[in-house]
Amino acid sequence: HVRERFRRLVDSGLKGSGDYGMLGFGVYNGQTANQPERNDDKHMIVRAAYPYEFANGQILEVGVSAYQGMFNVTKTAVVPLAGGAAVTPRGNNNIRDERAAAYFVLYPQPFGLQAEYTVGQGPQLSADRRSIDQSDLYGGYVQAMYNYKCSTYCLNVFPFVRYQEYYGGKKHEANAPRNVVRELELGIEYQFNQAIELTAMYAFTNRTSSAATGSNPYQENYGNLIRFQ
């Protein structure tokens, strides 16, 4: 029954996670996508999920996941908080990277709601910008959506609203600077057919810049933007 539910979520266009069973385990290089391995230490990940079907046919998927490994941080010279000449942060380039997360997805039939929250530790530039250490991180998102089924010209239309926050090191950037993200998105996804879809989103965003240059790097940026996919 579980595998049939996972398959049905994908086949019906509800964006299920796929028919991978209730328990999964993986090993990967840990240096993020399209990056060569730099320390020969593999990340290990485990995930468990279960799709519960209510009497009315609506499905609620709940799950947990966790990973750990050693992440190799790249470094570049940066001006310390106290000012002066730019220096390369101290600390080992290889820092333990570990996270645990819990999530749920109430699939839109027609109303839906999903959320995820993550906690962990990973590399992060210190507040004085003189060293890179293992520090706490946390964040998550919540999204509400509606599934409108088309009779002509499309399969489904999904209007949605999403809010997300993250506080922690941005490990894939040089020096792993502390990253603060607060973002509200309004969007709509239009599925022409099973092979073609168009998504438009408008975001109100507050994010930390990755720019390490200048006397006052890693500034928080505020703005609004529109995205198409």
Enumerate the language-model features and the residues they cover.
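Aromatic- and glycine-enriched pocket-lining scaffold segments that form the walls
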Residues: 1-65
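Outer-membrane beta-barrel pore domains
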Residues: 56-229
